[in-house]
From Swiss-Prot:
Residues 147-171, 194-361 are annotated as: Disordered. GO terms for molecular function: single-stranded DNA binding. The gene is Ssbp2. The modification Phosphothreonine is found at residue 333. It comes from the Eukaryota. InterPro entries: LisH (IPR006594), SSDP_DNA-bd (IPR008116). This is Single-stranded DNA-binding protein 2. The modification N6-acetyllysine is found at residue 6. Residues 18-50 form the LisH domain. SMART domains: LisH. Residues 204-219, 289-299 have a biased composition (Gly residues).
Amino acid sequence: MYGKGKSNSSAVPSDSQAREKLALYVYEYLLHVGAQKSAQTFLSEIRWEKNITLGEPPGFLHSWWCVFWDLYCAAPERRETCEHSSEAKAFHDYSAAAAPSPVLGNMPPGDGMPVGPVPPGFFQPFMSPRYPGGPRPPLRIPNQALGGVPGSQPLLPSGMDPTRQQGHPNMGGPMQRMTPPRGMVPLGPQNYGGAMRPPLNALGGPGMPGMNMGPGGGRPWPNPTNANSIPYSSASPGNYVGPPGGGGPPGTPIMPSPADSTNSGDNMYTLMNAVPPGPNRPNFPMGPGSDGPMGGLGGMESHHMNGSLGSGDMDSISKNSPNNMSLSNQPGTPRDDGEMGGNFLNPFQSESYSPSMTMSV
């Protein structure tokens, strides 16, 4: 506990200093109690050669012992059988009341488990692959700013931005606001092109949270070599900017397959992975699958790049069912209906398509 070899320091006494002090106090005690012969014998036997300066009677050793004995007798287990002072008893009582708990004494609140009740799904950063029940969010692509749509939900749930959480009444845990992951490009321009009609306001039933895909004003992803590249908006998770205009005829693919792209190596990410996920092409499971809101977000590719989406046109959105939300592929585009999450925004594996508003790929 103490440093050794520092005999010149009074703050940190060495073992030799402690022994000298104790011998001095013993000699002093013997003299004060009248045992002078014993005191001289004691000094000669320990071969004391230094000068001794005695303190006032009764001496330090005697005073120290009296204080120790009083406190020793006032301990709770001995105070009934030993005499002690009221000061010693009060000292023990105060020390016992102020002593911290041996288990939780030094643990500040907030360390370990959170204070208060833990909400359901607190330890679930992502939703489970299948979520039975619960509302299914409609797909909203309004021609207005994100702030003007009340009750809009982020396109992708949970786990990416811990600085902000948005709870959902029917989800298992907090839905967290996030920035779009790699593989996501924005949807929906600020003004629709000549052949692109503004889509319906909602695809689901009443009371369902909408996924806003309004125009965004974030930082554009730099791609000076391609005029058709899509700005990558990072201002808000639901704030997506789409291709600048587009005057193609109806039926023009808004998202061409990788074979139709002419700049697949540019610094832009494709909206979806047209090729079904394989062992070397990781899925990005973001939604509940065939029973929940966003099971079709699993096919987003996080590695391949494609900056051209062509002169997009929205054909129609299926209105057969509030839960029928899908994108159909053009002939010749690879498609995997058997694997959930293979197609973007196809959470329910619908086989019925209506001519009203199905987005083409």
